[in-house]
Protein backbone atom coordinates (compact mmCIF):
# COMPACT_ATOMS: atom_id res chain seq x y z
CA UNK A 1 0.00 0.00 0.00
CA UNK A 2 1.06 3.57 -0.61
CA UNK A 3 2.29 5.67 2.29
CA UNK A 4 0.04 8.67 2.98
CA UNK A 5 1.15 11.65 5.04
CA UNK A 6 -2.04 13.63 5.63
CA UNK A 7 -2.58 15.79 8.73
CA UNK A 8 -5.02 13.24 10.22
CA UNK A 9 -2.93 10.11 9.77
CA UNK A 10 -2.68 7.76 12.78
CA UNK A 11 -5.83 9.25 14.34
CA UNK A 12 -8.24 6.34 13.86
CA UNK A 13 -8.83 5.92 17.59
CA UNK A 14 -7.51 9.25 18.86
CA UNK A 15 -10.22 11.30 17.13
CA UNK A 16 -13.07 8.79 17.51
CA UNK A 17 -16.18 10.16 19.20
CA UNK A 18 -18.33 8.41 21.76
CA UNK A 19 -21.60 7.03 20.37
CA UNK A 20 -23.70 9.34 22.56
CA UNK A 21 -21.65 12.43 21.72
CA UNK A 22 -22.11 12.18 17.95
CA UNK A 23 -24.16 14.68 16.01
CA UNK A 24 -24.36 18.44 15.83
CA UNK A 25 -22.07 20.38 18.17
CA UNK A 26 -23.78 22.84 20.57
CA UNK A 27 -23.46 26.49 19.60
CA UNK A 28 -22.07 27.32 23.05
CA UNK A 29 -18.91 25.38 22.21
CA UNK A 30 -18.41 27.50 19.09
CA UNK A 31 -18.86 30.92 20.74
CA UNK A 32 -17.15 30.24 24.07
CA UNK A 33 -14.79 32.93 25.33
CA UNK A 34 -11.61 32.58 27.38
CA UNK A 35 -9.63 35.01 29.53
CA UNK A 36 -5.93 35.66 29.13
CA UNK A 37 -3.95 33.31 31.35
CA UNK A 38 -6.84 30.84 31.69
CA UNK A 39 -5.89 27.16 31.58
CA UNK A 40 -7.46 25.17 28.74
CA UNK A 41 -7.28 21.59 27.49
CA UNK A 42 -6.73 20.91 23.80
CA UNK A 43 -9.29 18.26 22.86
CA UNK A 44 -9.73 18.04 19.09
CA UNK A 45 -13.32 17.93 17.87
CA UNK A 46 -13.22 15.43 14.97
CA UNK A 47 -16.44 16.62 13.32
CA UNK A 48 -14.94 20.08 12.65
CA UNK A 49 -11.68 20.16 10.73
CA UNK A 50 -11.29 23.92 10.47
CA UNK A 51 -8.99 25.41 13.10
CA UNK A 52 -7.94 22.01 14.43
CA UNK A 53 -4.46 21.87 15.98
CA UNK A 54 -1.97 19.16 15.06
CA UNK A 55 -2.70 15.71 16.48
CA UNK A 56 0.44 15.77 18.63
CA UNK A 57 -1.13 18.50 20.80
CA UNK A 58 -4.35 16.52 21.46
CA UNK A 59 -4.75 16.09 25.23
CA UNK A 60 -2.26 18.80 26.20
CA UNK A 61 -3.01 21.58 28.67
CA UNK A 62 -1.85 25.16 28.29
CA UNK A 63 -2.70 28.76 29.04
CA UNK A 64 -4.40 31.27 26.74
CA UNK A 65 -2.01 34.02 25.66
CA UNK A 66 -4.05 35.82 23.01
CA UNK A 67 -6.59 35.78 20.25
CA UNK A 68 -6.09 35.74 16.49
CA UNK A 69 -9.34 36.31 14.63
CA UNK A 70 -11.76 33.63 15.80
CA UNK A 71 -8.94 31.42 17.06
CA UNK A 72 -7.11 31.43 20.38
CA UNK A 73 -3.37 31.26 21.01
CA UNK A 74 -2.53 28.62 23.61
CA UNK A 75 0.96 28.31 25.05
CA UNK A 76 1.90 24.74 25.99
CA UNK A 77 5.07 23.17 27.28
CA UNK A 78 6.68 20.58 25.02
CA UNK A 79 9.68 19.20 26.86
CA UNK A 80 11.79 22.22 27.81
CA UNK A 81 10.29 24.48 25.13
CA UNK A 82 7.16 26.57 25.16
CA UNK A 83 5.12 26.37 21.96
CA UNK A 84 2.19 28.47 20.82
CA UNK A 85 -0.72 26.52 19.31
CA UNK A 86 -3.39 28.28 17.25
CA UNK A 87 -6.79 26.66 17.74
CA UNK A 88 -10.45 27.50 17.35
CA UNK A 89 -12.67 27.33 20.46
CA UNK A 90 -14.40 24.11 19.31
CA UNK A 91 -11.15 22.27 20.08
CA UNK A 92 -10.58 23.86 23.51
CA UNK A 93 -12.15 23.17 26.90
CA UNK A 94 -11.71 25.32 29.99
CA UNK A 95 -10.04 23.60 32.93
CA UNK A 96 -12.41 22.96 35.84
CA UNK A 97 -11.02 23.36 39.35
Curated annotation (Swiss-Prot):
Signal peptide: none annotated. The keyword Calcium does not apply. One of its GO terms (molecular function) is structural constituent of ribosome. The keyword Ribosomal protein applies. GO terms for cellular component: ribonucleoprotein complex; ribosome. One of its GO terms (biological process) is translation. PROSITE patterns: RIBOSOMAL_L21E. Keywords: Ribonucleoprotein, Ribosomal protein. PANTHER family: 60S RIBOSOMAL PROTEIN L21. Belongs to the eukaryotic ribosomal protein eL21 family. HAMAP family: Ribosomal_eL21 (MF_00369). This is Large ribosomal subunit protein eL21.
Amino acid sequence: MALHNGPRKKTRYKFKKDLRSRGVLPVTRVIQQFELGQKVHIVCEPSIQKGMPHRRFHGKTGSVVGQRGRAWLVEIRDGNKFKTVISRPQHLRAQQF
